[in-house]
């Protein structure tokens, strides 16, 4: 669905990355007005923004005064994204200053506001910035955690602008909700698994599956947005790292099991969105397995992998929530109910698999069944929306939730 987006651009070296973010928005069919600060235009000129957006650049409260741009842009937007958000912009937004078109737009916006900070580590960690971020978040503004990496010059640390694809994914999540997520997971610790495991057969081959990790990453982002401390365990996922998570990368089912069981010990909720391989080769060939001269295929003996979800179900504390997944063919709901009982889980998310379904897509059609007998059948929708709905169900079941 096409939305009206204001893309604010702050005056930092990361301003050039906003060009890629703008491209992602426009290629998805969104209408984007770019509102750069005067300093941002010193990094990327107005003709670039106009060419990429197909819209005139809005950078001056004194241009087209009869259209009242300092009010109109914010009031008409479905989402305001500022990337990069400099230390100066954070301070102005927190204190309600309005000395240019972008800060005026932030004050008049009645839609969700998403800020992507980029600055040196010392500036991000300064008590004034910490207080400004806390103020903005308390008012419902979504402030993304900066990434860790190379900064301007030779410095490295926290303060790097998140990957444009990651900012875009978070924006999709906000648009799917229509608002900023409630902080109903604040103080909670959750574990999310994502992707698909691979079981090596020889140095070049493996047994695996087609899981992209998109649904699991959507769960992780949604949990961060709702205030949770998130441990994301990713198995062979080729997606930008979600902002604000503790990321653990694994390859095999054994590695996934070890990381998940350890992380789940003190978690309030565990979402097993990863697709572990059910089987692995009984032996690993140190050299590449060759074709035989007679054309006979080799026999590969398989052994069963540990059932991570079932182990988590046996280990889980009474107050802990476990969400498992089932990618099914045939009678999906009946198979899902049986799996829910076997795993001793609280919720199961069931989706039917087949050509052009689920794997790698941006949308999902699922049925969520609870151990209490509840059934929620969700229509096809963005995976971000699926994640938010499931988190709603989890929050409602967590002890102490109102």
Locations of the language-model features?
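A cross-family phosphate/adenosyl-ligand binding-site feature
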Residues: 1-402
């Amino acid at each position: 669905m096409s939305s009206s987006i204001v893309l604010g651009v702050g005056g930092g070296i990361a301003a050039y990355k906003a060009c890629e973010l703008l491209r992602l928005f426009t290629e998805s069919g969104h209408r984007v007005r770019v509102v750069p600060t005067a300093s941002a235009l010193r990094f990327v000129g107005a003709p670039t923004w106009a060419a990429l957006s197909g819209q005139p650049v809005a950078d001056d409260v004194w241009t087209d005064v009869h259209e009242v741009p300092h009010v109109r842009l914010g009031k008409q937007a479905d989402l305001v994204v500022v990337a990069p958000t400099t230390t100066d912009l954070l301070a102005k937004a927190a204190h309600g200053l309005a000395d240019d078109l972008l800060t005026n737009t932030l004050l008049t916006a009645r839609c969700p506001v998403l800020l992507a900070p980029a600055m040196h580590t010392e500036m991000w960690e300064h008590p004034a910035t910490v207080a400004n971020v806390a103020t903005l978040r308390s008012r419902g503004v979504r402030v993304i955690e900066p990434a860790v990496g190379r900064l301007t010059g030779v410095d490295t640390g926290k303060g790097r602008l998140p990957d444009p694809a990651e900012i875009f994914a978070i924006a999709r999540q906000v648009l799917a909700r229509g608002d900023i997520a409630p902080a109903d997971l604040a103080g909670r610790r959750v574990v999310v698994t994502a992707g698909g495991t691979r079981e090596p057969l020889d140095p070049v081959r493996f047994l695996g599956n087609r899981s992209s990790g998109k649904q699991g990453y959507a769960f992780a982002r949604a949990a961060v947005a709702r205030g949770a401390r998130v441990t994301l365990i990713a198995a062979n996922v080729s997606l930008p790292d979600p902002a604000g998570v503790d990321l653990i990368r694994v390859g095999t089912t054994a590695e996934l099991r070890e990381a998940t069981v350890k992380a789940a010990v003190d978690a309030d909720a565990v979402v097993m969105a990863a697709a572990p391989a059910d089987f692995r080769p009984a032996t690993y060939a140190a050299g590449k397995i060759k074709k035989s001269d007679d054309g006979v295929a080799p026999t590969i003996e398989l052994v069963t992998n540990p059932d991570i979800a079932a182990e988590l179900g046996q280990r889980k504390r009474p107050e802990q929530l476990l969400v498992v997944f089932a990618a099914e063919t045939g009678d999906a709901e009946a198979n899902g109910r049986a799996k829910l009982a076997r795993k001793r889980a609280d919720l199961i998310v069931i989706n039917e698999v087949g050509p052009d379904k689920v794997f790698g897509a941006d949308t999902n059609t699922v049925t969520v069944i609870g151990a209490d007998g509840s059934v929620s059948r969700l229509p096809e929708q963005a995976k971000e929306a699926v994640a938010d709905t499931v988190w709603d169900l989890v929050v409602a079941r967590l002890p102490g939730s109102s």
